[in-house]
Amino acid sequence: MKILHISNFVQKQNGRLYWNHCFKINNGSIRNGHNLCIFSDRDQSRMNILNKFNDNKILNKNLLSTFINFDPDLVIIGHADKIHNKTLREFKTIKKNLKIIEWNVDNYYLDNTEEKFKKRSDVIDAFFITNAHKNLITCLSENNSISFFPNIFDQSIENMKIFENNNFKYDIFFALSYGVGTGKIRSKKSDYDRETYLEYIHKKLPNIKTNFFGYNNIEPIWGSFFEKSLSQSPISLNLSRKPNIKYYSSDRISQYLGNGSCIFVDINSQLNDLFE
């Protein structure tokens, strides 16, 4: 199968986000024998300054040319908000039997996820999202579906076996990101609930050796530095932005569990259902 994957492949981040879901989907597609073509919407948008002033008209024109040249059987979209529905409709006009699916790893109540799904509902054949909130059904049209999929693990990326270590510098690890865009602590924060939890641990469990990032003026950590720090503790905190909803977790859960760290997760996520 020929697959066109449209997502943010974060070229401007210089490799610090190499564990993102978009890369794991690429890897899985190739391992399963498919011919893959990628299109990075945000990077393509930055390549021509005129996209700032014409609602990404040039970007969408380039995408249409890519579609025509590659002639895919399946189009996969992930967090590609700069792509117009009009462009996706043109895909289906050109190729009647084409299927378009969209994946999303955001909390239903955050980052305009509900609005984004509803906006795409008449052009997407199937949605896949890493939570199971009951209101997701309201985002559908008569001709598509929505399914839960867990955060993706990739053995070529999450390849540490922390559980085999015997000596650790710290007892517990946590990395607060404040979003992947800048990779820096924000002056206007929206994560006080998680910071409060970390402060509670420091006050109530002073003998615990913590290794926390993105907190208490310690900058977030990324790339191979993240992996090295993760490996220095046997346990990790998997704290996601609230509100807690069914089966949702930050995609950091893949890096924690996949690398062999024992994690603590909020019971209100109901993730324990998946292990019973």
Feature map (PLM): residue ranges:
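Nucleotide-sugar donor-binding catalytic core of glycosyltransferases
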Residues: 2-51, 70, 78-86, 115-276
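Catalytic alpha-helical scaffold of carbohydrate-active enzymes acting on polysaccharides/glycoconjugates
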Residues: 23, 60, 89-90
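N-terminal/domain-start segments enriched in small and hydrophobic, helix-friendly residues
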Residues: 60-80
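Glycosyltransferases and closely related glycan-assembly transferases
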Residues: 64-71, 85-100, 142
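A short, histidine- and acid-enriched strand-loop-helix "catalytic/donor-clamping" loop
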Residues: 98-113
